Amino acid sequence: MNRHWLTSYGERIPAEINPETSGSVLEMLEHAMKRYAEKPAFRCFGQTLTYADTDRLSRDFAAFLQAGLGIKKGDRIAVMLPNLPAFPLAMLGIIRAGATQVNVNPLYTPRELEHQLTDAGAKAIVIFSGVSATLAEIIDRSGLEQVITVNPGDGIGASLPSPPVDTRLKKVTPFADALAQGAELPLATPRLNGDDILFLQYTGGTTGLSKGAALSHRNLVANTEQFKAFTPDALRPGKEVVVTALPLYHIFALMVNFITYFSIGAENWLVPNPRDMAGFVGTLKQAHCTVFTGVNTLFGGLLMQPNIGEVDFSRLRVAIGGGAAVLPTTSEKWKALTGKHILEGYGLSETSPILTLNPMTGRGFSGTVGLPLPSTDIKLVGENDAPVALGEPGEICARGPQVMRGYWQKTEANAAAFTADGYFRTGDVGVFDARGFLKIVDRKKDMIIVSGFNVYPNEVEAVAAACAGVAECACVGKPDEKTGEAIALFVAKIPGATVTEADVIAHCRRDLTAYKVPKEVRFLEALPKSNVGKILRKDLRTLT
């Protein structure tokens, strides 16, 4: 196809990358641990892990998994952690043992966690002790053979307050003990190739149940190389300082902040709780970061802090925004504060994640999600998958070495997810301009994006419909200054029912992560429907 965006690349960006530069993510990251051994790799809670420390401790954890627990190549290990020092140690250990990591949001409810663990067939979980009660609720149905609990100071030798582990959990090994045991155990380095699955990255499903995008080592090596080729001035080996406030269980931070910047010897400041804005600003004051990533709500939250002007951003080279649309006002205020515009990009869990990004050479906020990365083909299609004319909207379909192999054990979903010629259907609608810049104009799906997190209406509706007194319900997104979008739920009551807005919200809080809980519940006599009985969400949107 005609990749007209290549004319906008400039001389320094190649049209293609080699996805085989490293045989695996393990090979790429082990090289970094040796090359930058004495450099700081991670900073958190006032402590530092060097690349050599990370090498040694992740090796010990890998040995514990392999020789201590009998984990074999391809086994799935769930990781349910915030941005603690144990996260990179656990991930590197899982890879070094030859296993596949299943990333889990620590804020998940028992229902959400149970589905993900059983769907993935996870053998063990590495979990923050503070959310162990969530696991305890479903441990007997989880299929797990071992639980490894993490405290905040694990891996860095810091004595920090630690939440108690729920006593209902059995077969529990503290992470610190796992490291100590692993130090005495042998490790057999697995033979990994590009086709081996590195991550199961779960993403919301239109049926209300999330699906695991099977991301291979080649997928992540490719997206790392694509990002490096596209932003060479933001990737100086051994010189970059990154602040990671976005959660590492999210593919954006995992690929960009961790894998890519670790591979070039960057210093990474972990922010375990970005909701603590005072502490977050304090970290920024200390870090003097050269690279910062965020979503619109994160940038906006920082800009509202009264002391953000005290942060020295003079070393900042690049700020990247993703997950949800960056508002023009946010980018303008960020530019006024830091001297740098936010480079907006676009991608999905299924694409490792980056498909497009605005170039660093841009003159300002473009209002687009940028150009397709090297080795990435994007076509926009209309009815019957026919290509649309330039300037016309169409569904964004993508092909490239960063696109997933498919959803984990979902044959039917995989057949529907790709076009006949192998392009992944994103479900988003976009428009290309004459220079090859892509603008997102709509979502073919009814997905709602709250603070950069995808929310699928069917999941929310399935939970809300189980509330006593609810006859039927439907939800849509509505604009929200703080979160970009918020969930508005419309309910038709069972005749005579006395259910209230507070009742429905309380019910949803029991089974949904906080960002999926409706912000507003409105009661209607009946929901608007088509002549075949389909609820008309477009009519509901006019009521928000």
What are these model-predicted stretches?
Residues 221-241, 251-290, 305:
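Conserved AMP-binding/adenylation subdomain of ANL enzymes
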Residues 20-21, 38-72, 78-84, 88-92, ...:
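Conserved AMP-binding/adenylate-forming core of the ANL superfamily
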